[in-house]
Amino acid sequence: MDFTFSKTGPSITAIFALFFIFYLRFRSKGSKNNAPPEAGGSWPFIGHLHLIGGGSRLPHITLGEMADKYGPIFTIRLGVHRTLVVSSWELAKELFTTWDVAVSSRPKFLAAKHMGYNFAMFAFSPYGAYWREIRKLIAVELFSIRSLELLKHVRVSETELSMKELYEYWNAKKDGSGQLLVEMKQWFGYLNLNVIIRMIAGKRYFGTTADGDKIEARQCQKVLRDFFHLAGLFVVADTIPFLGWLDVGGYEKRMKETGKEMDRIVEKWLEEHKQKANSGSKHDFMDVMLSAVEGTALQDYDPGTIIKSTCLSLIAGGGDTVTVMLVWTVSLLLNNRHVLKKAQQELDIHIGKERRVKESDIDKLIYLQAIVKETLRLYPAGFLGSPREFTEDCKLADYHIPKGTRLIINLWKTHRDPQVWFDPLEFRPERFLTTHKDFDVKGQNFELIPFGAGRRICPGISFSLHMLHLVLANLLHAFELSTPSHESVNMTVNAGLTNMKATPLDVLLSPRLSRTLY
């Protein structure tokens, strides 16, 4: 019998053979120098991708089960990339203190290349001079105490207006029992996008008094939704680079299209800001950036790219993160009605029913703050945090971690450590009034780091907490909340870049205050 080969046959065979040799050497290299244990179940070429990147099991749960078997520090292989998985707050503390500089960089994912202006987008930028300059600008001009106070009117006015619109919607659409069914994921999303886009670009896209183009508003919402979906996917090129040319699933093509659409929208904003720049007034962050970076070049990025990428990074992160947090907080309250009732009692005691909640009231709402902390413990915006990459060899728990290893901190596991948290799976805000009353979420208590820790900690923590407390307090004060037939809320998670609730959050609302207060 004769065998014939196509012209490409030998070359493809050679490529696979070379890759297999590389794979075996890579594994052998990883076994030296007292390497951490590697989880079982790895396959040639793909490593543990079949366990982590597909199927019905969520990655944080699978990795948590691996930690039960292999311990709080172990490695997996995502294609050709060795990845360290840490499931202990003590090890997280060592990483973000002793080895903080070494773990402050990001892997270069395809999404960051095509949708993040070739890694110019702040959230995805590698650690270095460019990242430090942009972070300093953001910290001073947008998220400092002074800046947050100057922008307070945006948070307050948007929250008040959203409550008014919600009341008017109830008044027009309420049923015979005086209730209105509202899908709160969308409502929270509109509110938070209005706040962050007003702060960044001076536009209000959603609601009855929106001042932006409705078509542009829908495009903006869609492109951000596509961004988060695509950025949260396992892409072949990120794990097995030599197969990237196949573009399995067409994800790279979609990323390029989404990146172009995002750029088209924000380029329009930038041109509008340039046209009004001669007035000398600075009303939003894009105005500030125009004067701060015009005529400069950081790491070969032109000023326009720096402005657009930074603004998009803040809009995507700020809007989605707070929305996710609010959705889970309300979901937990509806599944724990006694906690909801206690929160409303606290509001009635400190604010009463003759006025609305002010931002200055939040400091007095101790139980509400405990609810927020407990929600962030159980449902941080990302169960696996943001991926890091070691930029130098390190020694952790007596194990040698080579440069180039990727890092995952399993917050889902560390935040449920029974050695730290009594009844760790239960929603108990009271723990932050007693045993854990001195804990905060700003990266100092490594048992609770929903925003990350170290140099790469989320720069918008204070903004997120301001929004989370203000919106939640106003909603609980202004409306009674329940579910159809008093059913429990489905708590299924939709895994991705952030942990959004997989199903709608349908809530029955009715006013608690006099109509003159809306």
Range-by-range predicted roles:
Residues 1-5, 480, 497-518:
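C-terminal helix/juxtamembrane-tail motif
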Residues 1-32, 466:
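Terminal signal-anchor or tail-anchor transmembrane helices
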Residues 31-53, 60-154, 158, 184, ...:
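Cytochrome P450 substrate-recognition site 1
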Residues 49-71, 264, 357-398, 403-405, ...:
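Conserved cytochrome P450 K-helix E-x-x-R motif and the immediately C-terminal K′/meander segment
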Residues 107-115, 149-326, 342, 357-360:
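Cytochrome P450 heme-thiolate monooxygenase catalytic core
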Residues 312, 397, 434-468, 493-494:
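Cytochrome P450 heme-thiolate "Cys pocket" and heme-binding signature region
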Residues 337-339, 461-500:
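Cytochrome P450 heme-binding "Cys pocket" and the immediately downstream C-terminal segment
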Residues 409-439:
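Conserved cytochrome P450 K-helix/beta-meander segment immediately N-terminal to the heme-binding cysteine loop
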